[in-house]
Amino acid sequence: MTLNLLTAISPIDGRYRSKAEPLAEYFSEYALIRYRIRVEIEYFITLCELPLPQLSSFDKSLFPMLRSIYETFTVAGAQRVKDIESITNHDVKAVEYYIKEQLDAFSSAGNVPAGYFEPYKEFIHFGLTSQDINNTSVPLSIKEALEKVFYPQIEELISQLESYADEWKDVAMLAKTHGQPASPTRLGKEVMVFAYRLREQLNLLKSCRFTAKFGGATGNYNAHHVAYPEYDWREFGNRFVSEKLGLEREQYTTQISNYDHLGSIFDAIRRINTIIIDLDRDFWMYISMEYFKQKIKAGEVGSSAMPHKVNPIDFENSEGNLGISNAILQFLAAKLPVSRLQRDLTDSTVLRNIGTPLGHSVIAVQSTLKGLRKLILNSAALQRDLDNTWAVVAEAIQTILRREAYPHPYEALKALTRTNTKMTEAAIHDFIRTLDVSDKVKAELLAITPDNYTGI
């Protein structure tokens, strides 16, 4: 069966491909190969810049040509790497052989004299193990995917929420705690709660460190040191990882990354996802309470049986995708830091799944935005609930009575309002008029309504 949108096993690459497609530049097999080539080339260039004695004569003007191997890398190039891997049965070794092929191709094309690269080719992947390539490529891909795709989408969501918060800043709304009426609030402020929370957690995510393992077969630069003991390979590795890749080298590792900082990143993304789940559920409830209507698109169907249905499907889609994302992120954060002795292979297949939770997250964010942009404020419904729930001003009345040293104000209001009888404006006002307080205080109390008792 040919792979396409209809035959893909994962909905990320099938039904939702258009929403997740930007992540293919960072987490596809093609992308991983390109990142590996990038790390290998930049490492070779850094060895030339050192320079190692055998690389001192390498023409530095050829560096742009070397970088073009990954900068112009195509899917066809990735297929060639896979063809090599079918023989080597080793993905990183296939990358090394591919780069050497490209060097030969430069010679064949006349870009350099025939045989020019022969003295230098064995310094491709010099002294490295596969994880020096993987544990730099993967964090680099995550860093750039977050910067180019995830951060902008969360910023867009925050911006939309802030816009609504401003638009609805003066819209009074009955609050609900434990599902029951509580002191009134303002719709704009409740929306701003989510914008604030997302901003806080986005800043925490951005503060996470993107670290990489780069230190040879067991993290000690054994091969580098035995070949060139006169060089400070720790300093070299720190500089290479920082300056060429924009990452931070982990100073003590086994064969693989410690993955502790990746765990922090996954946990930070999960917190953002969780806030959006909370947002999705709240707006789902507001729609159910008729505080919002939804824009209707001609031709769309809400139910195969009930013609009238206009369902909050975007918020539901988002919530479902975020649940999947969080489950995988939690697993990644718990599994990756654990590896037997100096390394087992369990991290290898797990790392290939990092794009999956991020895919579900970006699908979810777009669904939430779509849902938010369908909303039509139903002011009448908000006003109806306020008008029908005068008991919520009891807090205001008892607090002012406390200020006035009135005896047992809380108990008096409790006796009045904590019943199964509906509390009306008239009942509240009749109660106020019986109070033994000054006319000024009575006027102050009579001015309180569910509409204006919304705090600051």
Residue ranges, per PLM feature:
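Short conserved catalytic/interaction loops centered on acidic-Pro-aromatic/His motifs
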Residues: 205-214, 283-293, 423-424
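Glycine-rich anion/phosphate-binding loop at the beta-strand->alpha-helix junction
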Residues: 201, 248-250, 254-340
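Catalytic-core signal marking the mid-to-C-terminal active-site face
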Residues: 2-29, 65, 71, 301-456
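Active-site-adjacent "gating/activation" loops or surface patches in catalytic cores
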Residues: 231-255, 259
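Generic, well-ordered alpha-helical scaffold segments in large soluble proteins
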Residues: 42-47, 98, 102, 145, ...
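Alpha-helical coiled-coil oligomerization motifs
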Residues: 166-169, 210, 284, 291, ...
